[in-house]
């Protein structure tokens, strides 16, 4: 399964110490550089920045080859996550922001938010 993630789901799961749900559910997760930069921003909680610094083996940073052309006002992380999901023909895009979800769905990407992925988690995760 190919999964691409935006910043918010990763940030929330790390803060509540449930980031291990991701490899349990999906194996490997791809993020674009803009998402990595947002996760490492000075305003990001220290726990998230430390998690990224010791990046787990299941998290891969991959740059999209093309930029996303859209009329919707999305931040760079959202645009790169959608572009990467399109390029790798992702099975799933983890993204929470409403406008980004609408744009991704318009592009026929399957989207799941942080809370939507929780019920799919195995009991041991």
Q: What is the role of each PLM region?
A:
Residues 112-125:
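Short alpha-helix plus adjacent loop in nuclease-associated cores
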Residues 1-92, 98, 102-110:
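Active-site-proximal, substrate-binding regions of enzyme catalytic domains
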């Amino acid at each position: 399964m190919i999964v691409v993630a935006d910043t918010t789901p990763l940030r929330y799961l790390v803060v509540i110490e449930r980031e291990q749900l991701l490899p349990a559910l999906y194996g490997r997760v791809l993020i674009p550089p803009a998402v990595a930069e947002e996760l490492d921003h000075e305003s990001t909680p220290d726990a998230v920045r430390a998690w990224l610094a010791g990046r787990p083996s299941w998290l891969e940073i991959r740059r999209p080859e093309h930029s996303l052309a859209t009329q919707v006002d999305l931040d760079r992380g959202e645009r790169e996550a959608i572009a990467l999901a399109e390029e790798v023909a992702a099975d799933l895009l983890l993204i929470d922001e409403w406008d980004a979800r609408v744009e991704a769905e318009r592009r026929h990407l399957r989207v799941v938010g942080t809370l939507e992925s929780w019920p799919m988690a195995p009991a041991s995760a």
